[in-house]
Amino acid sequence: MAGGAREVLTLQLGHFAGFVGAHWWNQQDAALCRPTDAKEPPGELCPDVLYRTGRTLHGQETYTPRLILMDLKGSLSSLKQEGGLYRDKQLDAAIAWQGKLTTHKEELYPKNPYLQDLLSAEGVLSSDGTWRVKSIPNGKGLPPFTNAITPKPVMPTEGSIRVWSDFLRVHLHPRSICMIHKYNHDGEAGRLEAFGQGESILKEPKYLEELEDRLHFYVEECDYLQGFQILCDLHDGFSGLGAKAAELLQDEYSGRGIITWGLLPGPYRLGELQKNIYRLLNTAFGLVHLSAHSSLVCPLSLGGSLGLRPEPPVSFPLLQYDATLPFHCGAILATALDTVTVPYRLRSSPVSMVHLADMLNFSGKKVVTAGATIPFPSVPSQSLPDTLMQLGEATPWTPLSACGDPSGTCCFAQSVVLRGLDRAHHTSQLAPGTPLPSPLHACATGEEVLAQYLQQQQPRVRSSSHLLLTPCKVVPPYPSLFSSSLSQHGSVLDGLPTGTAVESIPVLGALCSSSSLNRALGDLAKDLSKLDLRRWASFMDAGVEQDDLEETLQDLRSLAQCYEGGDDRLVD
């Protein structure tokens, strides 16, 4: 049980969602494994919001994500569907058939060297077949990290990572993984590539009952379920599955928050015409249907556009990443997600998912954009007011919702989180009598500094802000993306490169109801209206009718019109 926490159940739907989710859960796990000499005080974030306690059949306590994960056949690599900690009693049921048995064995995937190293560090498989996990402090997380006894971990290489399960370091509950065997992850045939295919999966009693059983298992053990967060691929058939799942949650758990993160890998190439057309159609159908059944929907992508015209991926001054690698893109988006979800994971004075959605989605604006500064440019010799002044009047975060350049747009409401700055740097340290460079330097607390800065940037915007000491953990298997000018804890240093591995970083993240969505959704509708659907009959054959397309197009235009105001190019 969560012991008074406002629990959240996560649904993770799709393969790119798996990459983002694996990094997300690894970061949660790293936050649990706090070093014994950590300077930041524990307890700002409540892990029980996302995790559940349980016991193996041998009585050993476990702490696993409250997660339902759906992916296709071939996506698990060497990870077992029932997980590695313990087996479900149903899975251990005796076989009643006494006749002759024929065994069919599939070729096993070789275990990734990183995961082999992880397992040897966490426990051993004893001679009686029982997995013996090494001692867990306070029943949660892995043993404390100490350099004296812990060998340097094997770092996964980009070449060794084929699927998200190759670098997931978190043990899952047997009820977490639900495989869809009628479609393949690999190969060109049998792919889940259209919205209608995804919708039809949850119309089949087999998969619908399996999802409902898992939902009931997790929900019934919660003391106070605040809602659901859905990590869902938008570009393929999982957009339809996600829409159907959101509809199910809305029907069965009325009044609970449903926040959907629509995930898009990037970039895409002009030469892949059918793939791009399907991506356009799936994204349009997904956004419309997900917004109808969710409290809030946020597209997440490092791409520059939702439409057919490709735009360069976004850039970060202190990161170097390969936008073609899901391993890299997933890490960056997970870091943003770990920051913008802070309000409903706080231990003290949390903002519920429902209240966060209500603050952002007024007047029908259920779609929001995300942005983040990764890492936030903290300099040891500067205070937060100094850093914010240097950012100037430009938008202080990189856009992460494929809505293009935010210049010339306005914000209707926003939720902003800044995490990972030492308290000593929250306010100005100027000597008494020194002229103040800005009103920010007169603020008494870091919370006042951040709130006043946001008010200066967007004077008439409904705004909520949080300032945390807890940084974002970026230890292996998080990829090495950071500038050589960063310290171990993500500060920007002067002089020669340090050569030190970055283990944690400060991050600024935001969710915004932005007029940039007027342009982005409007352009998406224009691209959709220009399609000759006779050329893409295979998409329609998957269960989508012509009337469905016309209705989606109209809904998309109506959704875009909700965001008129402040943009220099509104929808016609």
From Swiss-Prot:
Pfam families: Misat_Tub_SegII (PF10644), Tubulin_3 (PF14881). GO terms for biological process: mitochondrion distribution; mitochondrion organization; positive regulation of mitochondrial fusion. It is found in: Mitochondrion outer membrane; Cytoplasm. It comes from the Eukaryota. Keywords: Cytoplasm, Membrane, Mitochondrion, Mitochondrion outer membrane. GO terms for cellular component: cytoplasm; cytosol; mitochondrial outer membrane; mitochondrion. SUPFAM superfamilies: Tubulin nucleotide-binding domain-like. Disulfide bonds: none annotated. InterPro entries: DML1/Misato, DML1/Misato_tubulin, Misato_II_tubulin-like, Tubulin/FtsZ_GTPase_sf. Involved in the regulation of mitochondrial distribution and morphology. Required for mitochondrial fusion and mitochondrial network formation. Belongs to the misato family. This is Protein misato homolog 1. The gene is MSTO1.
